[in-house]
Design a protein with these regions (language model features):
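Conserved glycine-rich cofactor-binding loop
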Residues: 10, 17-18
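Conserved glycine-rich Rossmann-like NAD(P)H-binding loop of the short-chain dehydrogenase/reductase
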Residues: 31-47
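The beta1-alpha1 cofactor-binding region of Rossmann-like NAD(H)/NADP(H)-dependent oxidoreductases
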Residues: 61-71, 103
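Substrate-binding pocket helix/loop in short-chain dehydrogenase/reductase
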Residues: 97-98, 102-107
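Active-site helix of classical SDR
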Residues: 121, 156
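Residue(s) in the substrate-gating loop at a strand-loop-helix junction
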Residues: 140
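SDR active-site lid
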Residues: 173-239
Length: 291
């Protein structure tokens, strides 16, 4: 598929204060795109916007808030004149056994990752139809394979993958393209936060190669940018993820067998696993909800 120049395009990135969102905003800006940053950390968003080489601005908003996101969409269009690209990247995570999980944190992962993505699309689709633009929904390896101790995250990412695939067919005749982005464990604040828990870190290290590695962020984001330039339906931040699609039907059975052994091994320590949202992004979400 031919590339679309990003020069002069207007891109909205949610979850843009750090990690994938922050670096993606920078790389889009370096290619000439004007960037609207959305998130829950005003100081960080302002700093990111100030470092970008192209025209950029930021908005404080909770992606689960319909009215707030609709207002952001109106203001971004008023500020830049149009919107060509929306990247639904905002996300949080929590680990640990489902039975012992904090129900509030578990539900919040679903709300931010799945419902928040749908709220984002609902707010920006009208302007994307005007520009015949592109919506990239960030999913994960967790959409392809189950991961014990990460039930909320897997459920949310499986959900956004399914919803985005449905949406693609619904909006195609308007000229809007919809993509799904897949990332394995990538060196972000969220992954580093999860690794602070000894059990979660050791479980991850026992995954089969190449899923047991933490991958550098810049090459992953470069591949996401390339997917945006091509308006791709599937974007793989690590190339080997493409091959996982062909075997995903076998993975639940394999994971059930291997997972039983591994969870039994760690059973005496499972009660020690943190039940809160991980990383600075999780802390920002908790602070926002606390008022």
């Amino acid at each position: 598929m031919s590339k679309v120049s990003l020069q002069g395009q207007v891109a909205v990135v949610t979850g843009a204060a750090r990690g994938v969102g922050e670096l993606l905003a920078r790389k889009l800006s370096e290619r000439g795109a004007k960037v609207a940053l959305v998130g829950l950390e005003p100081d960080e968003l302002k700093a990111v916007a100030g470092r970008l080489p192209s025209d950029a601005d930021w908005w404080y908003a909770d992606v689960t808030d319909h009215e707030a996101l609709a207002q952001v969409a109106r203001e971004v269009k008023a500020r830049f004149g149009k919107i060509d690209i929306v990247v639904a990247n905002a996300g949080v995570a929590v680990g640990g056994p489902f039975e012992e999980s904090d129900p509030v944190a578990w539900r919040r992962v679903i709300e931010v990752n799945l419902v928040g993505s749908a709220v984002t699309a609902r707010a920006f689709l009208p302007v994307l139809k005007e520009s015949r633009g592109y919506l990239l929904q960030i999913a994960s390896l967790a959409a392809i394979t189950p991961a014990p101790m990460m039930s909320a995250y897997c459920a949310s990412k499986s959900g956004v993958e399914a919803y985005a695939n449905c949406l693609r067919a619904e909006v195609a005749y308007h000229g809007v393209k919809v993509g799904v982005g897949y990332l394995s464990w990538t060196d972000t604040d969220m992954v580093r936060g999860a690794d602070q828990d000894d059990v979660m870190r050791e479980l991850r290290q026992r995954l089969p190669w190449p899923a047991n590695k933490t991958y550098p962020l810049p090459p992953a984001v470069d591949r996401i940018v390339a997917g945006i330039e091509r308006r791709s339906a599937k974007v793989y931040a690590q190339p080997w993820l493409r091959g996982m699609q062909s075997i995903r039907g076998y993975l639940p059975g394999i994971i059930a067998t291997v997972g039983k052994r591994e969870i039994k091994r760690f059973a005496p320590r499972l009660s020690q696993v943190s039940t809160g949202l991980v990383g600075s992004g999780g802390a920002a979400d908790e602070k926002h909800r606390a008022g």
